[in-house]
A protein has these predicted regions:
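Amphipathic alpha-helical coiled-coil/heptad-repeat segments
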Residues: 1-179, 183
Length: 186
């Protein structure tokens, strides 16, 4: 249901934020590698460890078997759809739904993995790659945050609608009971 989907999105957003934090550290390490006298092989070991942590974050950003950040929920036919309501048109009932896509943080990891400051002859290009992947990870986090907020809003609306319907039904029941009591007293 919607609660499970919202929890999946919240978990994915947390994973994407973690990947963004790690991407920022990689950008800093690649920039540091441009400093004269730095042992670039040691810096590369740090980058390799960060990329490994990034992979772990992507794998662990799973809720109830759903991983919305590994790229499997991206593209036509792979979207996630959750039923968020019921509608009535004349005598026919149907459902309303909310559809969204996951993100592909695996592609970000792959691009970061390709950076090798230990052997690179173009550290400026490596830095541009790392910065581009950082921007992509921030976009992914933002997208998931927007989706999470949309689901929150829909859940709040449904809760309010349910409360209103409950109140309306209670009023009708109270009115029927008052009418019946008046009839019995007559």
């Amino acid at each position: 249901g919607m609660t499970a989907t919202k929890n999946s999105v919240a978990t994915a957003r947390l994973g994407a934020e973690t990947v963004s934090d790690i991407a920022q550290q990689i950008v800093e390490r690649v920039a540091f590698a441009q400093t004269d006298g730095v042992d670039r092989a040691d810096v590369q070991l740090e980058i390799d460890a960060l990329v490994k942590n990034m992979g772990t974050a992507i794998e662990q950003a799973t809720f109830n078997g759903d991983n919305l950040v590994d790229g499997t929920k991206v593209g036509v036919g792979n979207e996630v759809t959750v039923v968020n309501g019921v509608k009535r048109t004349g005598a026919t009932f149907g459902t309303t739904s909310f559809t969204f896509e996951g993100v592909d943080l695996g592609a970000i990891k792959t691009a970061m993995e390709a950076i090798d400051v230990g052997t690179s002859t173009d550290l400026a290009a490596d830095l541009a790659t790392a910065e581009g992947q950082l921007a992509a990870s921030i976009t992914a986090s933002t997208s998931l945050g927007i989706t999470e907020n949309a689901l929150d809003g829909q859940m709040e609306f449904i809760d309010s609608l349910t409360d209103t319907l409950d109140s309306g039904v209670s009023s009708m029941v109270d009115a029927d009971m008052e009418e019946e009591a008046a009839r019995l007293q007559a």
